[in-house]
């Protein structure tokens, strides 16, 4: 097996079979290139790699003081690479199969409570066209749990408001349908009927929902700044970004008793373990559950 040929085939596999984004593909190839460089240093051929060699490689990488998260991601990338070799090159074993990833302490994301969300939305000046647009943005972010990249690329042709669904393009160009609540629908209709017609829409942006004052697609940075300005306006001390609304959407659903698989589908998570981070519940809520339901409380 020649590294150059294998890497080209692996890239094609990630593009066509896994349907990954360019960013994710680059990350996988970067992991493989690290292993290739180490093999060259040790004068080991690709078909000679075994579990012991991978262990030595990981120890070598660890000497550069990389984080446990980066180590885990690297090992995950190599697992995918060797699984590909098993499929496409009939490699007999996967030398990463028996190796354990470093234990990760998942950071619980910062979320907003309902009062904070209401305060942010109430701080918007609705006397301006931009204010009405911004209110709609926050209602959709919180009401649908979108990534900011999904929000700014949202298309009018993918709004099915009569049946209360929208379609978004997520990571790896994967499409998914998401239910949308009445409040978000209400303001989307107002924005589309009363605000957007006053914007001089530029060619190529006719189908984009959220536009700037020049009629072009909003940038992710612009959405970030809108939210930062509102947080400053109400004196919100905790760190906040567009993604905070996605975290809040998921957390409030799970705390309210929503099925974790349903939340996973709405968020577009490939793995249920990613969604499980939202099963954290504040101590006051836990205490209220004990008080209400336990026979000896």
What is each residue range found by the language model?
Residues 1-297:
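Conserved catalytic core of the tyrosine transesterase superfamily
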């Amino acid at each position: 097996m020649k590294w150059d040929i294998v890497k080209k085939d692996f890239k094609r596999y990630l593009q066509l079979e896994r349907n990954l984004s360019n960013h994710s593909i680059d990350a996988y190839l970067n992991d493989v290139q690290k292993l290739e460089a180490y093999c060259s240093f040790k004068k080991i051929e690709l078909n000679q790699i075994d579990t012991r060699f991978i262990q030595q490689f990981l120890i070598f990488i660890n000497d550069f003081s990389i984080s446990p998260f980066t180590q885990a991601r690297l090992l995950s990338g190599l697992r995918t690479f060797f699984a590909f070799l098993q499929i496409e090159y009939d490699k007999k074993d996967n030398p990463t199969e028996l190796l354990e990833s470093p234990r990760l302490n998942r950071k619980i994301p910062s979320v907003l409570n309902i009062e904070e969300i209401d305060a942010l939305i109430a701080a918007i000046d609705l006397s301006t066209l931009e204010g009405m647009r911004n209110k709609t943005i926050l209602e959709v972010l919180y009401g649908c749990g979108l990534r900011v990249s999904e929000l700014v690329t949202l298309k009018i042709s993918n709004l099915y408001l009569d049946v209360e669904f929208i379609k978004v393009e997520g990571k790896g160009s994967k499409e998914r349908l998401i239910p949308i609540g009445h409040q978000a629908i209400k303001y989307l209709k107002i924005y589309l009927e009363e605000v957007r017609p006053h914007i001089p829409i530029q060619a190529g942006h006719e189908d984009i929902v959220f536009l700037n004052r020049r009629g072009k697609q909003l940038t992710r940075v612009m959405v970030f700044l809108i939210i930062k300005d509102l947080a400053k306006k109400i004196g919100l001390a905790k760190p906040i970004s567009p993604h905070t609304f996605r975290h809040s959407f998921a957390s409030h659903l799970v705390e309210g008793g929503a099925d974790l698989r349903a939340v996973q589908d709405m968020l577009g998570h490939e793995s249920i373990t990613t969604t499980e981070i939202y099963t954290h519940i504040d101590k006051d809520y836990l205490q209220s559950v004990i008080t209400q339901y336990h026979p000896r409380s």
